[in-house]
């Protein structure tokens, strides 16, 4: 996109003369708009089970004991004044009827009686008109005779009150964020995720080896749906969020989330796109509905169930059911999977990537698995943030799917990631962090509850975020790999076939925990850098990406944010400052005109120099003191790449076989 802003992409923008943070001009927008094998699916946020036996033990991990900073009188803790319940605005009968239909029992074919507002509030509120008076039918349960209170699209302040008052383990931190606990599950449960397999999805979806899609039948889904709906209807109150996915106004999706916890409601308030009052008034019937009954287990003896946890997606009914896990990330990633199904039907590519834009309108995509630096590198003081995790690439350009960011917090430091640090304030959800019991200051280094601590905040909490979160077509596609083997160059320029090869491979390397006594790095491959969430075969997404990169003249890059001078344990991690210099050189275009030389085995083109980066690390073998060890390690990694890619060799990519042949030839060459 040209820097004069003449090109429109879902909401015009221009650059004002007033300087923003770090001399970056502000955007002015118009209102609108066990160790897994190589064939297994890589999961970004799986966490081991929390080491506790009771709920009280879990809560005891959350708060660190310390001497109080202010003496307490009479040896008692200072009290907190009570807060009033949430306000109850005038009810929309249409909204209540719509929610009642969402919560209808499939057996009784009637929705619950709904009241808008907090059941603890004394205020009189309107309710859904009851159907004509008749004698109770034989299949009416006690829950069908009561009213269920609906807390619809509450504000963050109201959700804070609900969480602190009714959800044990909810606290306000020293910076104003809401600290919560997700219970026994502190990460996603991919082995408990199910997708309904019917005549349509059997033909369309990716099934079998390497696929994240584990089948279930329609009947079992309906059993779990009924269990979830009955549980939600048995509660005195439920939280309902009506929100959107995708900032592209022509392709946004209406989603409804029905949940039992204020924590879940606030999480989705932050992560989805928040509607205006006018949009909410005319919201109507959602395109997709989530029933989050995570506090209630599924029946593990039900067909296709393997535990008390089940996360079920029915693409035909456009519904998702969550039972037996309170980890909020299941909702976020469940919807991402749905977008991976819906968007390609509209010829729109859904991407697990970060995205930012320079002041001249140049857009970059960042692909990478957990720990590669995707969020860190896409959040750049000198560029506008379009999004940190989920995007769409359409004929109009790129758009963020979400309305918020979900950042890892482990070892978070103000000096290393100031934007994320400063975003943790009022309205932000902090999951499973440990804090001082008196000062409420969070210790981001403490892993007592889990290593997978997270912060969920609205994207506008990032100072340089671009609202609306849309941009022109990308100029650069950056593939990030944290190579713990230490043999990949810090920066490589890729041709189209190489870009597709590494995109389909989705490589990074993990280091086993010290408790296992293993220090060798482990290669991990996740197709399209997000195999845990994709619905179609990876080659379908690769074909779409190749087509769009060709049409827009985008350049592919492979950036190693891992080790240099040796593998993990002998080498050293490439400094973040060097990686930022490399990324800056990509953005500026200087690397396009650099001189390159080609590496052995992988055939990667590496620049002879990058300003601000030591030349000795650009060629990996030069940084290794033991050259023979380097050659052996390089061959080992190349073999792992080839073994992983065997799954895809029989699939055609694109309209003809030429691209497929080029991609196969772009892999390691022994």
From Swiss-Prot:
Domain of life of the native organism: Eukaryota
One family name in Pfam for this protein: PEPCK_ATP
HAMAP family, per the entry: PEPCK_ATP
Gene Ontology molecular function terms on file: ATP binding; kinase activity; metal ion binding; phosphoenolpyruvate carboxykinase (ATP) activity
Binding site for Ca(2+): 269-270, 403
Location relative to the cell: Cytoplasm
Species: Arabidopsis thaliana (Mouse-ear cress)
UniProt keyword Chloroplast present: no
Tissue: Expressed in flowers, siliques, seeds, stems and roots.
Reaction(s) the record says it catalyses: oxaloacetate + ATP = phosphoenolpyruvate + ADP + CO2
Record pathway: Carbohydrate biosynthesis; gluconeogenesis
Role description: Involved in the gluconeogenesis. Catalyzes the conversion of oxaloacetate (OAA) to phosphoenolpyruvate (PEP) through direct phosphoryl transfer between the nucleoside triphosphate and OAA.
GO biological process: gluconeogenesis
Assembly with partners or alone: Monomer.
GO cellular-component term (any): cytoplasm
Name of the protein in its database record: Phosphoenolpyruvate carboxykinase (ATP) 2
Leading EC class: lyase
Family, as annotated: Belongs to the phosphoenolpyruvate carboxykinase (ATP) family.
PROSITE patterns, per database record: PEPCK_ATP
UniProt keyword terms in alphabetical order: ATP-binding, Calcium, Cytoplasm, Kinase, Lyase, Manganese, Metal-binding, Nucleotide-binding, Phosphoprotein, Pyruvate, Transferase
Keyword Metal-binding: yes
């Amino acid at each position: 996109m040209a820097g004069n802003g003449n090109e429109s992409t879902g909401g015009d923008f221009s650059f004002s003369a007033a300087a923003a943070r770090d001399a970056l001009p502000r955007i002015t927008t118009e209102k609108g708009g066990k160790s897994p094998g190589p064939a297994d699916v890589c999961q970004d946020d799986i966490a081991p089970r929390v080491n506790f036996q009771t709920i009280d033990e879990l809560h005891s991990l959350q708060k660190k004991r310390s001497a109080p900073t202010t003496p307490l009188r009479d040896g008692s803790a200072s009290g907190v004044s009570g807060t009033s319940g949430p306000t109850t605005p005038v009810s929309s009968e249409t909204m209540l009827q719509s929610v009642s239909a969402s919560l209808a029992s499939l057996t009784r074919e009637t929705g619950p009686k709904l009241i808008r507002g907090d059941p603890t509030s004394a205020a009189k509120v309107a309710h859904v008109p009851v159907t004509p008076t008749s004698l109770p039918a034989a299949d009416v349960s006690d829950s069908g005779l009561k009213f269920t209170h609906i807390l619809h699209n509450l504000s963050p302040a109201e959700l804070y009150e609900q969480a602190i008052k009714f959800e044990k383990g909810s606290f306000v931190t020293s910076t104003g964020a809401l600290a919560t606990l997700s219970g026994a599950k502190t990460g996603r449960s991919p082995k408990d995720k199910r997708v309904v397999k019917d005549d349509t999805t059997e033909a369309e979806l990716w099934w079998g080896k390497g696929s994240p899609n584990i089948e279930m039948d329609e009947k079992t889904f309906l059993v779990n749906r009924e269990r979830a709906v009955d549980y939600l209807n048995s509660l005195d109150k439920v939280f309902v969020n009506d929100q959107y996915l995708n900032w592209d106004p022509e392709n946004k999706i209406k989603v409804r989330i029905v949940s039992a916890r204020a924590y879940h409601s606030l999480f989705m308030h932050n992560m989805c796109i928040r509607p205006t009052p006018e949009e909410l008034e005319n919201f109507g019937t959602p395109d997709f509905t989530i029933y989050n009954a995570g506090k209630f287990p599924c029946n593990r003896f039900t067909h296709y169930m393997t535990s008390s946890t089940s996360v079920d997606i029915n693409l035909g009914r456009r519904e998702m059911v969550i039972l037996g896990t309170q980890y909020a990330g299941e909702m976020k990633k469940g919807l991402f999977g749905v977008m991976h199904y819906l968007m390609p039907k509209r010829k729109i590519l859904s991407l697990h990537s970060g995205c930012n834009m320079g002041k001249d309108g140049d857009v970059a995509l960042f692909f990478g698995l957990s720990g590669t630096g995707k969020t860190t590198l896409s959040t750049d003081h000198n560029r506008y943030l379009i999004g940190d995790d989920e995007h769409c690439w359409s004929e109009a350009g790129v758009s963020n799917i979400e309305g918020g960011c979900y950042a890892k917090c482990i070892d978070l430091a103000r000096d290393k990631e100031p934007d994320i640090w400063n975003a943790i304030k009022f309205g932000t959800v902090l999951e499973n962090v440990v804090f001082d019991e008196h000062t409420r200051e969070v210790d981001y280094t403490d892993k007592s509850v889990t290593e997978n601590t997270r912060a969920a905040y609205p994207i506008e909490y990032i100072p340089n975020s671009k609202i609306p979160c849309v941009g022109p077509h990308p100029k650069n596609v950056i593939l990030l790999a944290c190579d713990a083997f230490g043999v990949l160059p810090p920066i490589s320029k890729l041709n189209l076939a190489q870009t597709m090869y590494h995109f389909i491979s989705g490589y990074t390397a993990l280091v086993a925990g010290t408790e296992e006594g293993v220090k060798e790095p482990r290669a991990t491959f996740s197709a399209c850098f997000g195999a845990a969430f994709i619905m179609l075969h990876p080659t379908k997404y690769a074909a779409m990406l190749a087509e769009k990169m060709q049409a827009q003249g985008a350049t592919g890059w492979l950036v190693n944010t891992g080790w240099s001078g040796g593998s993990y344990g002998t080498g050293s991690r490439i400094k973040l400052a060097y990686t930022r210099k490399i990324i800056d050189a990509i953005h500026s275009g200087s690397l396009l005109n650099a001189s390159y030389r080609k590496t052995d085995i992988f055939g990667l083109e590496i620049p002879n120099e990058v300003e601000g980066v030591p030349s000795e690390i650009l060629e990996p073998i030069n940084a290794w003191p033991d050259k023979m060890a380097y050659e052996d390690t390089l061959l080992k990694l190349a073999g792992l790449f080839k073994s992983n890619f065997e799954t895809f060799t029989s699939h055609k990519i694109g309209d003809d076989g030429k691209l497929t042949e080029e991609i196969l030839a772009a892999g390691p060459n022994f």
